[in-house]
Amino acid sequence: NCYGVWEEGFTSTEEDPRGVEADGNLDGKGPDHTPQSNFKIENMTIENLSKEAEMQDAIKIRRGAKATIVNALVKGSGLVTDLVDLKDGKGNADATTTISVSKELSQATANDVNGTGNVTVANGNTGVSTDTFAWTGYKF
């Protein structure tokens, strides 16, 4: 379970800020190294409420990483360029990457999916329940 939010007014000094980023090997220099990253995320929400910061990729998997992402939701009023990006100049995501994501964005993305993998973009995913984080006192 995870929830990432860029609040209204958030700015970033990064060249290519992302919601989640996963690499399989150090800077693409070890594609033959084993094991590579192979992980699962279940029940994830990424929310961009900032009109000042453009999220380059909501989900970026690259350089040999293999991801299984289930019940992901990307939402908000801020700009997200790529919903899911599986390509990189130093190595793409593992082709067996599987992602199920819904989007509730008020602005269109340039690309829903960039790269090769088993990515499903469809309505119906709920992401993580905010009740999970009630103990923090954060007001969603």
Feature-to-residue mapping (PLM):
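Extracellular beta-rich repeat passengers
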Residues: 1-140
